[in-house]
A protein has these predicted regions:
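Family-specific functional microsites
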Residues: 1-216
């Protein structure tokens, strides 16, 4: 991936604006109305839900544990004299949830490096080298293991419904009975496209069934 794309993705993470289903509804409500999280099929797929979805829990736990292992190995490498890591391990940043009052692992995914973490590390080592490495590890792991996987899932699902980039552009800002549509044929085409997608979602292929077929 190009460095400009990596930067764009990091900025979008920071401002919680990756293209989740809830985010897509803002531009394509007609298309995504009623859609739920592609992984569990139960909750609305908000930014926070991508990382706290039950279906991603074991993966995220693995990433979190590997992050702690990596951090400890870096600390041992840079300062073999440290013997007690309990203050570090007790930080709230290792919790996999969202919390309005405390920084959690979800905030690390966004790219935040909380002061409480840097304060502890500062006592022990040359901070910057470790922070850069840890930050990059979390970014690469959550991006590859959770976000990219989720995106290929959605892509496959959309393809099965005939939703292409071109079709999305056609449907963007579309509202029935507005004045933009001036030919009957155009109107008919747009209703057809929407109806067939809706039928697929609501009556044809059940989303959950589709997902289980895809994974089995
Ligand atoms: Zn979910």
């Amino acid at each position: 991936m190009s460095s400009s794309k990596v930067k764009a993705h990091k900025v979008h993470l920071l401002i919680e604006e990756i293209p989740t289903i809830e985010q897509m509804k803002k531009s394509f409500l007609d298309l995504y109305d009623g859609w739920k999280c592609p992984s569990c099929g139960l909750e609305d797929e908000t930014f926070d839900h991508v990382w706290t979805c039950d279906e991603h829990r074991s993966l995220l736990l693995k990433i979190k544990n590997n992050t702690i292992d990596l951090l400890l190995s870096l600390l041992i490498e840079y300062n073999p004299d440290i013997t007690d890591y309990s203050a570090l391990l007790m930080l709230n940043i290792w919790t996999i949830s969202t919390d309005p009052d405390n920084f959690t692992f979800v905030d690390l995914i966004k790219g935040f490096i909380p002061l409480e973490l840097t304060q502890i590390l500062n006592l022990w080592i040359q901070l910057l080298l470790v922070i850069i490495e840890i930050r990059q590890y979390i970014y690469e792991q959550t991006f590859k293991e959770i976000w990219i996987r989720r995106c290929s899932f959605i892509k496959e699902f959309e393809r099965s419904l005939g939703i292409t980039k071109k079709k999305k552009l056609t449907l963007k800002n579309f509202r029935p009975f507005n004045n933009i549509l001036n030919s009957d044929r155009e109107l008919e085409y747009k209703f057809d496209a929407l109806d067939s997608i809706r039928n697929n979602i609501y009556f044809g292929k059940n989303i959950i069934e589709f997902y289980s077929n895809l994974t089995s």
